[in-house]
A protein has these predicted regions:
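Append "and occasionally in soluble cytosolic enzymes with long acidic Gly/Pro-rich linkers
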Residues: 47-161
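Extracytoplasmic/peripheral linker and loop segments enriched in polar/acidic and small residues
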Residues: 46-55, 59, 63, 67-70, ...
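Structural recognition of the beta-strand scaffold that forms the well-ordered cores
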Residues: 16, 25-30, 56-60, 67-68, ...
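Extracellular/periplasmic solute-recognition and catalytic clefts
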Residues: 1-36, 68-70
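Secondary-structure transition/capping motifs at alpha-helix termini
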Residues: 7-14, 126-129, 160-167
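Periplasmic solute-binding protein
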Residues: 18-45, 58, 85-97
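Acidic-aromatic pocket-rim loops
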Residues: 19-23, 28-36, 174, 178-221
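Short helices/loops that flank or line small-molecule/ion binding pockets
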Residues: 1-8, 52, 153-161, 178-191
């Protein structure tokens, strides 16, 4: 480490944390809500366990429009469609990992027609289970992160406009300035939340850690 720090060619490569471009961002659904009763956690629990409900929300999210809050010029360059981001690893032929096999066919998950189709299926299924509408979707953000509040506003307006305010009620909530990760995500005080993950090593598998767990593990923390 001392050699790197003393070398003009390498000293700027040392950082106390990962560079910001070494993170992926994605939304998580909370299947074990611990938020206040006013946001109807039991109702949310029933709704989020319905596959068509989850597909409706996923298909209704226009990621490009959200990313445009942060990068208005070329937002599509920052939208990822795979768990492993593009331009991270390549095979021996120089082909991007995300363009190999079935991943090459993956496209934008935003699909208005599919979102409405899933919504209608979810409505009838959830109504039979006693779910009340609109389903409250608690969406907190960290006020110390620049423009995260604006991202949430765009998500709220865009998704409610497509799915209808009679189906979902996205509630944007300001989280704490200190200890956001522990207070909100780790304590389950959200319905839907923008989360992130960083690469630990130079292999595509490093990005999959939040999405599976071994027996006895508590999952993404």
């Amino acid at each position: 480490l001392d050699d790197w720090l003393s070398n003009e060619d390498t000293k700027n490569l040392i950082s106390r944390e990962r560079p910001r471009n070494s993170y992926s961002y994605f939304y998580c659904f909370n299947f074990d809500p611990q938020f206040d009763a006013e946001y109807e956690p039991d109702n949310w629990r029933k709704a989020v366990n319905n596959e068509n409900f989850r597909k409706a929300l996923s298909s209704a999210l226009n990621k490009t429009k959200e990313v445009a809050v942060l990068e208005p010029n070329v937002p599509e360059d920052y939208v990822i469609q795979t768990i492993t981001p593009a331009k991270f690893t390549y095979n021996a032929d120089g082909t991007d990992f995300t363009e190999i096999g079935d991943m090459a066919a993956l496209g934008d998950t935003f699909n208005e027609a599919k979102a409405v189709e899933y919504r209608d299926l979810a409505k009838s299924e959830l109504a039979a289970e006693g779910v009340t509408f609109p389903v409250k979707v608690l969406l907190p953000y960290n006020p110390t992160e620049v423009n995260w509040d604006k991202e949430c506003q765009v998500v709220e307006q865009q998704m409610e406009s497509l799915l209808g305010t009679d189906f979902i009620d996205i509630i944007v909530q300001t989280g704490p300035t200190d200890g956001f990760l522990t207070e909100i995500r780790r304590n389950g005080k959200y319905a839907m939340l923008k989360c992130n993950w960083g690469a630990d090593y130079a292999d595509p598998e490093t990005w999959t850690d939040p999405f599976y767990q071994a027996k006895g593990e508590n999952g993404y923390d």
